[in-house]
């Protein structure tokens, strides 16, 4: 991490969620709610899943109820507290994920809206690290914004950095880091379903 905490888009963006984490939880309670079940349908029972940027822990609960073994990671202390009621969670920066977990630890990596605050220059390193954390033929789901502008957005509860990925740019980034693309959904978000090869 080269930025100081005062200038780091990830640190500033993550801190903004502390203003009202309950409102965030309520706003996104049903957002893309069918995706976790689709993801787990690709996995064997009892799979180890990394919920990257787990937020309040909605998907940790869903994965646990489905018989899987999720662990969440988030940088925001308020989200860590909330998510820990749903299952195992640790506090950490996803940009340093390879120093937190050992290679080939997970059957699946779930990154729903957790890469949105990374700058494009950081995404290649993070995707390569995620690939290393997956077991052979492990699955990745990643969802990022496809519309809007890249840059700072002042919202009612704080300032956040968003990186948008128009057209096929995110799919290209995932493929270039050694993943096989199984499916891509385009819309306001780009959703990539991929496998480690």
Model-derived regions, located:
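A short SAM/SAH-binding and catalytic strip from SAM-dependent methyltransferases
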Residues: 108-121
């Amino acid at each position: 991490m080269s930025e100081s905490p005062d200038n780091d888009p990830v640190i500033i963006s993550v801190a903004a969620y502390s203003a009202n984490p309950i409102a965030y939880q309520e706003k996104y309670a049903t957002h893309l709610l069918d995706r976790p079940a689709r993801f787990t349908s690709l996995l064997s029972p009892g799979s180890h899943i990394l919920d990257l940027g787990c937020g309040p822990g909605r998907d940790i609960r869903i994965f646990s109820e489905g018989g899987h073994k999720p662990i969440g990671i988030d940088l925001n202390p308020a989200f860590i507290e909330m998510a820990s009621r749903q299952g195992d969670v640790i506090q950490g920066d996803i940009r340093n994920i390879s120093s937190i977990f050992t290679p080939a630890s997970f059957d699946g990596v779930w990154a729903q809206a957790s890469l949105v605050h990374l700058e494009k220059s950081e995404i290649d390193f993070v995707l390569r690290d995620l690939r290393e954390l997956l077991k052979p033929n492990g699955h990745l789901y990643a969802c990022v914004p496809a519309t809007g502008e890249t840059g700072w957005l002042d919202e009612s509860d704080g300032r956040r950095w968003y990186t948008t990925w128009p057209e096929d740019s995110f799919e290209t980034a995932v493929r270039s880091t050694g993943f096989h693309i199984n499916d891509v959904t385009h819309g306001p978000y780009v959703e990539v379903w991929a496998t480690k090869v």
